[in-house]
Amino acid sequence: MTSFNDGRTVRVVIPARYGSTRLPGKPLVDLDGEPMIVRVHARVRRALPDADIVVAIDDARIAEVLDARGIRFAMTDTGHASGTDRAAEVARVSGWPDTDAVLNVQGDEPLVPTALLQAFAGFCGAAPDLGVATVACPIDEVALLDEPAIVKVVVDHRGRALYFSRAAIPFCRDGRPADSAGSHGLFLRHIGLYGYANATLQALASAAPCELEQLEKLEQLRALWLGMPIDVMRWPDAPPAGIDTPDDVARVVSLLKRQTHDATEPY
């Protein structure tokens, strides 16, 4: 188990769903000789060597790969609609205390920086009143404000989320800034890394989807709808994108090869 400054214990769940419309069997896709889920687990383990890490799966084929490598996993309900639901099941079945922090690290992000994982674990572990936490970075290209695939978040003076949207928020009534969007400190891009107090995670997973969540297709809006505060940790830049399609595989493999050649972790 990992704790920070005598704070709360931090645990990690990596959801891995076998069925993917755009990339069937995604957790087991080969990335330069290793299945993707193995690489994600290795990245998390390198960042948090003492943490309790569980891969939440839904298929025996993933179990076989993980078992052969001695990686801890939990078989979860195949009917879950999201990784949050899988993380909640693992935390509940494992009997983790309500106050423990549960990090949800997406299983299709093999290039998530270890420094980001370490910083976020520390952020969640040290938070005195953790409910939900996530990450955002500056938007440094004005054009990204109009990109629906880039989720934007607006925060208050405490660093808590006011709203997430695929639309350009905040809206500039007098026209877009001429320089980089990020220089204003108001235009933030959401990074899909989450941390929860286990009690909050269970409450969130048991609640029905809200209308805003269904409209924007953004699960985190459920927490705001329920009145749950979301603390946003700022990070300087966006990590490399994860894997959703076959084209993404070649891009990630190229970055992995470069990383190995450089003997560093720039990605």
UniProtKB/Swiss-Prot annotation:
This protein's GO cellular component annotations are:
cytosol
UniProt pathway annotation = Nucleotide-sugar biosynthesis; CMP-3-deoxy-D-manno-octulosonate biosynthesis; CMP-3-deoxy-D-manno-octulosonate from 3-deoxy-D-manno-octulosonate and CTP: step 1/1; Bacterial outer membrane biogenesis; lipopolysaccharide biosynthesis
Quote the EC number.
2.7.7.38
What's the top EC group for this one?
transferase
The record's listing under Pfam families reads: CTP_transf_3
Q: Which CDD domains match?
A: CMP-KDO-Synthetase (cd02517)
Q: Which biological process terms from the Gene Ontology are attached to this UniProt entry?
A: CMP-keto-3-deoxy-D-manno-octulosonic acid biosynthetic process; lipopolysaccharide biosynthetic process
Question: According to its UniProt record, which reaction does this protein catalyse?
Answer: 3-deoxy-alpha-D-manno-oct-2-ulosonate + CTP = CMP-3-deoxy-beta-D-manno-octulosonate + diphosphate
Primary location recorded for the protein, binned into one broad class? cytoplasm
**UniProt keyword Transferase, yes or no:** yes
**GO MF annotation terms:** 3-deoxy-manno-octulosonate cytidylyltransferase activity
| Transferase found in the keyword field | yes
Keywords, ordered alphabetically: Cytoplasm, Lipopolysaccharide biosynthesis, Nucleotidyltransferase, Transferase
Q: Where in the cell is it found?
A: Cytoplasm
Tell me which domain of life the UniProt entry assigns to the organism this sequence originates from.
Bacteria
Q: What InterPro entries does this protein's entry cite?
A: Cytidylyl_trans, KdsB, Nucleotide-diphossugar_trans
Q: What does this protein do?
A: Activates KDO (a required 8-carbon sugar) for incorporation into bacterial lipopolysaccharide in Gram-negative bacteria.
- PANTHER family in the cross-refs: 3-DEOXY-MANNO-OCTULOSONATE CYTIDYLYLTRANSFERASE, 3-DEOXY-MANNO-OCTULOSONATE CYTIDYLYLTRANSFERASE, MITOCHONDRIAL
- Say which family it is in: Belongs to the KdsB family.
Please give the name of this protein: 3-deoxy-manno-octulosonate cytidylyltransferase 2
Which species is the source of this protein?
Answer: Burkholderia ambifaria (strain ATCC BAA-244 / DSM 16087 / CCUG 44356 / LMG 19182 / AMMD) (Burkholderia cepacia (strain AMMD))
